[in-house]
């Protein structure tokens, strides 16, 4: 409740109201009960499994990545203040924005924390890798070992509806 910083990697499923009022922490879980990410204002949450009902209710900031293997997450997510979108493949994103598809090696690594409106695939994969490192999670290993198959299933990225507009207007 109300974490402002730090990282949390939990191997297994958590109960109701996980990451409520999260305002800056990064957290990974393998499933969550009802009301996950409720009133979240910042930070990043990764859910590597099913969610309960009313996910993201009142969420006004941050990003949540949810593995949606069966395509039913939209029925359990409260869409009043958030939108769902696919996690773009990095090569597609680089090509569409910078015409540098397949060129990450040439340009070096990017700071994935400096711009929360881009770098979703790299950020997500990095966070799942840390989850595997700290928890030895079989779920994380399975996902990373078959990334090309799982990335599209992760295809749900949640951002507060005005997150990108606000970020652009403040710069």
Question: Which role fits each region the language model picked out?
Answer:
Residues 1-171:
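Long, distal/terminal scaffolding or interaction modules
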């Amino acid at each position: 409740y109300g974490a402002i910083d730090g990282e949390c990697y939990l191997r297994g499923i958590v109960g109701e109201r996980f990451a409520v009022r999260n305002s800056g922490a990064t957290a990974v879980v393998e499933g969550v009960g009802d009301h996950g990410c409720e009133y979240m204002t910042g930070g990043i949450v990764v859910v590597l499994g099913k969610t309960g009902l009313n996910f993201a209710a009142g969420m006004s900031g941050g990003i949540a990545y949810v593995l949606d293997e069966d395509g039913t997450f939209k029925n359990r997510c409260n869409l009043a203040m958030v939108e769902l979108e696919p996690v773009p493949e990095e090569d597609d994103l680089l090509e569409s924005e910078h015409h540098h598809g397949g060129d990450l090696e040439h340009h070096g690594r990017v700071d994935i924390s400096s711009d929360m409106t881009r770098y979703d695939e790299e950020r997500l994969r990095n966070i799942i890798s840390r989850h595997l490192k700290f928890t030895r999670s079989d779920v994380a290993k399975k996902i990373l070992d078959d990334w090309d198959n799982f990335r599209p299933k992760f295809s749900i990225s949640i951002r507060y509806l005005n997150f990108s507009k606000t970020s652009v207007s403040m710069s």
